[in-house]
Structures are given as structure tokens and as C-alpha cells.
Amino acid sequence: MCIRDSWEIAGLLSPEPLPTFPNGFPKEVLDEFTARTGYQVLCNKPYSGTEVIKDYGEEHMKTGALIVYTSADSVFQIAANEAIVPVEKLYEICAEARRMLVGKYGVGRVIARPFVGDCAANFTRTPRRHDFSLVPPADTMLDVLQQAGKSTIGVGKIHDIFAGKGVSETIRTSGNTEGLKVTMELADRDFDGLAFVNLVDFDMLYGHRRDVAGYAAAAAEFNDWLPTFMDKMRPDDILMVTADHGCDPSYTKTTDHTREYVPFLIYGKNLRHGVDLGTRYCFGTIANTVCDALDVKACLAGCSVWNEIKA
């Protein structure tokens, strides 16, 4: 999951790249973090999330120091064993780090990474991860739709990605299976607006972990779910399927995101079928198309394809 790409899907192009720290965070950042939270720091490198708790988890449990690490993304991640730092305390620490990390150190996300276990052999991350994101610096399609009186329902981590900005209703989910269940239930609801859903398991559990079999099973689950959802859709409902980046589970040189083109699939019973939309230059195409479909005027990055697909 990449915050900047998700913002672009919503029609906001970040004018500058969010900062990354391939050599770890500067001493002044860590000193300020310790002064604010009272905790020392271990690691301070780009690291795989599962490997970092294996390599530093036992030292963390002995010393109480927090495991701070980053990745190729603009993130400040804090891992702590739930037996050493209760989850609510970890959230407080992350919230303080979020307040601290601004300006040139304004990472896209501060991420709480709780884990359990008593030794390196059995350390396991728990589902209680929580993201503390930068507030988008300008309006996105969520704000535009909300201001027009439309519902904006965020499912999964959408609230976290946009720091709640423009989200009128939040439904948190534990993974793909629950996300698909919630989306199916939303098809039965009578609302006028957007349900924005992210299925984070493709990224977090299978893409980054390079789990080809797990990714295939998740894709099969979605494929099995899709026909039932399409049958349930009302005549004026529209489904869009896309991604904010690649995360090829078969690419083994790194565990970071990969750079293939992402899909942009649109379906609606009252839309034209079989239209080739070509290769678009900007994810903001999605935001503008959503706004056009809902008859809401918007001035967002990208160009709508609504005129190409409407019947």
C-alpha cells in the first residue's frame, strides 16, 4: 500500500515525492523521538517487517527499546511485542511520532507493528497494525463528493490512507475475506455516493512476503466472489477494479513494490462493454471518472473516461 499512489487514485498529485530514508533516520530524528517518548531505538534501517522482529525482537524484549525501521516507501515503522508494550501504548507512541515527523521528515505513514511470541522462532505480527498518515495537502475526490452531499464510505484502510479526510463512514476490516463480505453487503444498501474498498492482503500478506501460492489463492477468492457481486449490482451501479502499485509475489530480488502497470477495469450493467481504455498517464483518471459518473463537478488531476464508457 502506497499513500502517494492512493492519493493519486483520488485525484491528488503530490507536488514532491514524500521523503524516504534508505540509510535510516538521522540522529536528530531519533534523539527527538526518544526525548518525546522515553524509548530508545533498535535497528533504524530499511528492513523486512517479518525479518526485523526475528533479528531484533529478543533484544527488544530484554531492553524495552523499540524496533524502528523503514522500507523503500515513505514510512516510519515501530514494532513492539504486545507483552512489553501494550498495543494502546504503542498507538500513543506512534501518534506522538506522527506529530513529530513533519516538514522534511514528514513521512507518508507512521505504522504501529505489534507482534507476539517469546523468542525469534515464534515471533508473529498481529492484525492490530495501525497507520498514522499525513493529512492529504489538498482536496481529493472524497472531499469533492462529500461536499456535494454524496456518501463516501471507506472500507479497510481507506480511512487511514486519507487520515479520515473526506471519509463520511469508516468500516474497518481484518483482511480480504471480510472486505469482500462488507462490499457485498454494501451492494444491498441504498446510498448515493462511493464505497472505496482496499483489499490489503494482496499487498501485505502475499505481495511483500513473496507468497505466490497465497496470492493465487487470494486472487481465486476474488474471482469466485466477483460474479455474485456483478449479478447483485443494480442497473446504475458501477464497479471499478484497480491497484495503487504492483507487488509481484514472484519477484525475488527485493520484497518492495514492483513497477508493472496496474489494471483499470470498469463494469456496469448500463455501461458500454468491451471498450479499450488504453494506457492512462495518471491514476487520477479514476477520480475524475467517479465524479463524472456521480454527476459531480471536480477539478482533480487526470482525465475522465466517462464519455468513452457511458451508454
Which residues make up each language-model segment?
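Feature captures the catalytic ectodomains and active-site-proximal regions of enzymes
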Residues: 1-311
